[in-house]
Protein backbone atom coordinates (compact mmCIF):
# COMPACT_ATOMS: atom_id res chain seq x y z
CA UNK A 1 0.00 0.00 0.00
CA UNK A 2 1.44 3.36 -1.01
CA UNK A 3 2.28 5.97 1.59
CA UNK A 4 0.21 9.09 0.95
CA UNK A 5 1.42 12.64 1.57
CA UNK A 6 -0.68 15.35 3.18
CA UNK A 7 0.51 18.65 1.72
CA UNK A 8 -1.09 21.75 0.23
CA UNK A 9 -2.17 21.08 -3.36
CA UNK A 10 -1.70 17.30 -3.17
CA UNK A 11 -5.29 16.78 -4.34
CA UNK A 12 -4.63 18.47 -7.71
CA UNK A 13 -5.17 16.40 -10.86
CA UNK A 14 -1.50 16.76 -11.79
CA UNK A 15 -0.52 14.66 -8.74
CA UNK A 16 -0.26 10.96 -9.57
CA UNK A 17 1.06 7.87 -7.84
CA UNK A 18 3.93 5.86 -9.29
CA UNK A 19 1.76 2.73 -9.13
CA UNK A 20 -0.98 4.39 -11.21
CA UNK A 21 1.60 5.53 -13.77
CA UNK A 22 3.31 2.13 -14.01
CA UNK A 23 -0.04 0.32 -14.24
CA UNK A 24 -1.11 2.61 -17.09
CA UNK A 25 -4.10 3.96 -15.16
CA UNK A 26 -2.79 7.55 -15.33
CA UNK A 27 -0.76 9.47 -17.90
CA UNK A 28 1.73 12.22 -17.12
CA UNK A 29 2.43 15.46 -18.90
CA UNK A 30 5.71 16.11 -20.69
CA UNK A 31 7.61 17.43 -17.66
CA UNK A 32 7.49 15.30 -14.53
CA UNK A 33 8.66 15.84 -10.97
CA UNK A 34 9.22 12.43 -9.35
CA UNK A 35 8.94 12.79 -5.57
CA UNK A 36 10.97 9.97 -4.05
CA UNK A 37 14.29 8.57 -5.20
CA UNK A 38 13.99 5.05 -3.88
CA UNK A 39 14.01 2.01 -6.15
CA UNK A 40 10.43 2.33 -7.40
CA UNK A 41 10.76 6.11 -7.81
CA UNK A 42 13.96 5.76 -9.85
CA UNK A 43 12.56 2.94 -11.97
CA UNK A 44 9.40 4.97 -12.63
CA UNK A 45 11.52 7.99 -13.56
CA UNK A 46 13.51 5.83 -15.99
CA UNK A 47 10.30 4.43 -17.51
CA UNK A 48 8.98 7.96 -18.06
CA UNK A 49 12.26 9.28 -19.48
CA UNK A 50 12.44 6.37 -21.92
CA UNK A 51 8.95 7.44 -23.04
CA UNK A 52 10.29 10.90 -23.89
CA UNK A 53 9.33 12.72 -20.70
CA UNK A 54 11.58 15.32 -19.06
CA UNK A 55 12.01 13.99 -15.52
CA UNK A 56 13.44 15.41 -12.31
CA UNK A 57 13.75 13.24 -9.20
CA UNK A 58 13.56 14.99 -5.84
CA UNK A 59 14.85 12.99 -2.86
CA UNK A 60 14.89 14.05 0.81
CA UNK A 61 17.96 11.95 1.65
CA UNK A 62 21.58 12.63 0.68
CA UNK A 63 21.44 10.23 -2.26
CA UNK A 64 18.94 8.34 -4.37
CA UNK A 65 18.46 4.61 -3.78
CA UNK A 66 19.48 5.03 -0.13
CA UNK A 67 16.15 4.33 1.60
CA UNK A 68 14.73 0.93 2.33
CA UNK A 69 16.41 -2.37 1.63
CA UNK A 70 19.75 -2.07 -0.19
CA UNK A 71 19.79 -3.21 -3.79
CA UNK A 72 22.64 -5.23 -5.30
CA UNK A 73 25.65 -3.03 -6.06
CA UNK A 74 25.78 -3.72 -9.80
CA UNK A 75 22.03 -3.05 -10.14
CA UNK A 76 22.51 0.28 -8.38
CA UNK A 77 25.40 1.29 -10.64
CA UNK A 78 23.44 0.33 -13.75
CA UNK A 79 20.31 2.22 -12.66
CA UNK A 80 22.27 5.38 -11.77
CA UNK A 81 24.06 5.20 -15.14
CA UNK A 82 20.73 4.81 -16.97
CA UNK A 83 19.25 7.79 -15.13
CA UNK A 84 22.21 9.88 -16.32
CA UNK A 85 22.04 8.47 -19.85
CA UNK A 86 18.38 9.44 -20.18
CA UNK A 87 19.02 12.94 -18.83
CA UNK A 88 17.10 12.58 -15.59
CA UNK A 89 17.92 15.42 -13.21
CA UNK A 90 18.39 14.43 -9.56
CA UNK A 91 17.86 16.88 -6.69
CA UNK A 92 18.79 15.51 -3.25
CA UNK A 93 18.36 16.89 0.26
CA UNK A 94 15.04 18.44 -0.80
CA UNK A 95 11.42 17.65 -0.02
CA UNK A 96 8.10 18.50 -1.59
CA UNK A 97 6.48 21.33 0.35
CA UNK A 98 3.52 22.22 -1.83
CA UNK A 99 1.96 21.48 -5.22
CA UNK A 100 1.11 24.59 -7.23
CA UNK A 101 -0.72 25.23 -10.49
CA UNK A 102 2.63 25.57 -12.29
CA UNK A 103 4.47 22.75 -10.53
CA UNK A 104 5.73 22.52 -6.98
CA UNK A 105 7.62 24.19 -4.19
CA UNK A 106 10.60 22.29 -2.79
CA UNK A 107 12.36 22.95 0.49
CA UNK A 108 15.92 21.97 1.41
CA UNK A 109 17.48 21.19 4.78
CA UNK A 110 18.35 24.83 5.36
CA UNK A 111 14.68 25.75 4.79
CA UNK A 112 15.41 27.41 1.45
CA UNK A 113 12.46 27.14 -0.90
CA UNK A 114 12.55 26.86 -4.66
CA UNK A 115 9.74 26.72 -7.18
CA UNK A 116 9.94 24.18 -9.99
CA UNK A 117 7.68 23.85 -13.00
CA UNK A 118 6.17 20.49 -13.89
CA UNK A 119 3.14 19.27 -15.79
CA UNK A 120 2.83 16.29 -13.45
CA UNK A 121 3.96 15.39 -9.95
CA UNK A 122 4.44 11.65 -9.40
CA UNK A 123 4.58 10.55 -5.77
CA UNK A 124 6.58 7.52 -4.67
CA UNK A 125 7.71 7.99 -1.07
CA UNK A 126 7.42 4.41 0.07
CA UNK A 127 5.04 1.62 0.86
CA UNK A 128 3.55 0.05 3.96
CA UNK A 129 2.22 -3.43 4.59
CA UNK A 130 -1.35 -4.21 3.60
CA UNK A 131 -2.90 -6.88 5.82
CA UNK A 132 -6.50 -6.36 4.70
CA UNK A 133 -6.87 -9.74 2.93
CA UNK A 134 -4.96 -11.60 5.66
CA UNK A 135 -7.19 -10.11 8.37
CA UNK A 136 -10.31 -11.02 6.38
CA UNK A 137 -9.22 -14.66 5.97
CA UNK A 138 -7.59 -15.15 9.40
CA UNK A 139 -9.43 -17.85 11.33
CA UNK A 140 -11.26 -19.06 8.22
CA UNK A 141 -8.34 -20.90 6.62
CA UNK A 142 -6.33 -23.46 8.59
CA UNK A 143 -2.91 -22.78 7.15
CA UNK A 144 -2.77 -19.08 6.41
CA UNK A 145 0.60 -17.35 6.39
CA UNK A 146 1.47 -13.68 6.45
CA UNK A 147 4.25 -13.11 3.89
CA UNK A 148 5.42 -10.66 1.25
CA UNK A 149 4.10 -7.11 1.29
CA UNK A 150 1.26 -8.17 3.59
CA UNK A 151 3.91 -8.83 6.24
CA UNK A 152 6.29 -5.97 5.44
CA UNK A 153 6.63 -3.79 2.36
CA UNK A 154 9.85 -4.87 0.67
CA UNK A 155 10.90 -6.34 -2.66
CA UNK A 156 10.16 -9.42 -4.73
CA UNK A 157 13.25 -11.24 -3.44
CA UNK A 158 11.98 -11.04 0.15
CA UNK A 159 8.51 -12.20 -0.87
CA UNK A 160 9.88 -15.24 -2.72
CA UNK A 161 12.31 -16.03 0.10
CA UNK A 162 9.60 -15.96 2.78
CA UNK A 163 7.29 -18.12 0.62
CA UNK A 164 10.15 -20.59 0.12
CA UNK A 165 10.84 -20.74 3.86
CA UNK A 166 7.19 -21.49 4.62
CA UNK A 167 7.05 -24.09 1.85
CA UNK A 168 10.13 -25.86 3.18
CA UNK A 169 8.95 -25.82 6.79
CA UNK A 170 5.32 -26.93 6.43
Model regions: which residues?
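Glycine-rich Rossmann-fold phosphate-binding loop(s) that bind the pyrophosphate
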Residues: 36-38, 126
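A conserved FAD-binding loop/helix module that cradles the flavin
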Residues: 41-44, 63-76, 132, 138-141, ...
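Short beta-strand/turn micro-motifs composed of small residues
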Residues: 36, 59-61, 148
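A Rossmann-like FAD-binding core segment of flavoenzymes
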Residues: 1-5, 9-30, 50-136, 140
Amino acid sequence: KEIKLKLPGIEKEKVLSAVDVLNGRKKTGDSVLMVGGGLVGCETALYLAKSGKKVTIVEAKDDILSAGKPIPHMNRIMLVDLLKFYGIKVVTCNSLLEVTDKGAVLIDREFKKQSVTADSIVICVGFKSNRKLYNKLHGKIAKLYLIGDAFKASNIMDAVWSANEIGLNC
